[in-house]
Amino acid sequence: MHNPRKTHPLIKIVNHTFIDLPTPSNISSWWNFGSLLGMCLIIQILTGLFLAMHYTADTTTAFSSVAHICRDVNYGWLIRYLHANGASLFFICIFLHIGRGLYYGSYMNTETWNIGVLLLFTVMATAFVGYVLPWGQMSFWGATVITNLLSAIPYIGTTLVEWIWGGFSVDKATLTRFFAFHFILPFVVAALTIIHLLFLHETGSNNPSGLNSDSDKIPFHPYYSIKDLLGFFIATLVLMLLVLFTPDLLGDPDNYTPANPLSTPPHIKPEWYFLFAYAILRSIPNKLGGVLALVASIMILALIPMLHTSCQRGLTFRPLTQTLFWILVTNLLTLTWIGGQPVEQPFIIIGQLASILYFLLITTFIPLAGLLENNLLKW
């Protein structure tokens, strides 16, 4: 019998990806976040497209165009806040997705993992340039501070910064190009997502036991399509609660003041999802050192497959490493808190200790715990 679902060149790709995909029978709700990220990306691209129809990327009108969207465009306020809080939901899902990967040893699929690290960098770049667009105080000063970090690169730094700015300061040229980047990057993210899925489906999904599940696979549809639908409803509920009740909860009040190059806000800080990296950046009193630590704090994820020392894949049956994993999680929450605090004691020393512990846990303590657990298994 001719079944287009299995024979049509395009439909069969969808079939092998979302319908007849052999999936482990025991994956938990922690495996929902991949599809949730797909949902977030679609929400962001759609709301972003409608915002771009009304936004003007010019220093004189950018701020008022965002106000115009919220006041005069039909449901413009809803689209704007869905986009702003959708970014927060996106990062919550990303952090949980990466945390799941770390806990269950999903990073052993190295190609999938490395594309994921690349995706993280791209999404972070997208969020950064997007935050500049409303042209409020925090937009302007955030752009100034973060782009200025590139001047720490020896020899070419200053030239590079002025090239990115398109002048001698963050100005009209910077805003225009950031809008261009913010428009194109989500499509780069979408392309990388397809590659991420391609590599994942070469090996198949990992599962909570960390064992090979080839002997016990079930079709993705209807089992996990229905299960993912529950995740979609919960995530949408959380997003709508944020958007409709406390739309500015995660934003910065300073961004409701139009950008003013002559007035520096008392505390320059990025959106909450960058605070952990910002705290690591600030914990080093040297500019170049801080920039290197900032990049290393994300790039270290690419080293994790090489730092795996245990005989077992996940942490399900490894209580010692489990403890270290949760210490790492609390450490990252501490860094997030510190990133939003002013640069004064005791926050400086807490940030420095948390930064040191972050790198030590990943590069030293967790690999050593893996070796110790291997030896304990021989008793």
From Swiss-Prot:
Q: Which residues bind heme b b562?
A: H83, H182
Matches recorded under CDD domains: cytochrome_b_C, Cytochrome_b_N
Positions with a binding annotation for heme b b566: H97, H196
Transmembrane annotation, as ranges: 33-53, 77-98, 113-133, 178-198, 226-246, 288-308, 320-340, 347-367
Ligand binding (a ubiquinone): H201
List UniProt keywords, sorted A-Z: Electron transport, Heme, Iron, Membrane, Metal-binding, Mitochondrion, Mitochondrion inner membrane, Respiratory chain, Transmembrane, Transmembrane helix, Transport, Ubiquinone
Localization in the cell: Mitochondrion inner membrane
GO CC: one term? respiratory chain complex III
One GO BP annotation is: mitochondrial electron transport, ubiquinol to cytochrome c
| Co-factor: note | Binds 2 heme b groups non-covalently.
> What PROSITE patterns does the database record attribute to this sequence?
CYTB_CTER (PS51003), CYTB_NTER (PS51002)
- State the needed cofactors, names only: heme b
The molecular function terms in GO held by this entry are: metal ion binding; ubiquinol-cytochrome-c reductase activity
Bilayer topology annotation: Multi-pass membrane protein
Query: What is known about its subunit structure?
Result: The cytochrome bc1 complex contains 11 subunits: 3 respiratory subunits (MT-CYB, CYC1 and UQCRFS1), 2 core proteins (UQCRC1 and UQCRC2) and 6 low-molecular weight proteins (UQCRH/QCR6, UQCRB/QCR7, UQCRQ/QCR8, UQCR10/QCR9, UQCR11/QCR10 and a cleavage product of UQCRFS1). This cytochrome bc1 complex then forms a dimer.
Further remark, if any?
Heme 1 (or BL or b562) is low-potential and absorbs at about 562 nm, and heme 2 (or BH or b566) is high-potential and absorbs at about 566 nm.
Main function: Component of the ubiquinol-cytochrome c reductase complex (complex III or cytochrome b-c1 complex) that is part of the mitochondrial respiratory chain. The b-c1 complex mediates electron transfer from ubiquinol to cytochrome c. Contributes to the generation of a proton gradient across the mitochondrial membrane that is then used for ATP synthesis.
Q: Its family?
A: Belongs to the cytochrome b family.
What protein is this chain from? Cytochrome b
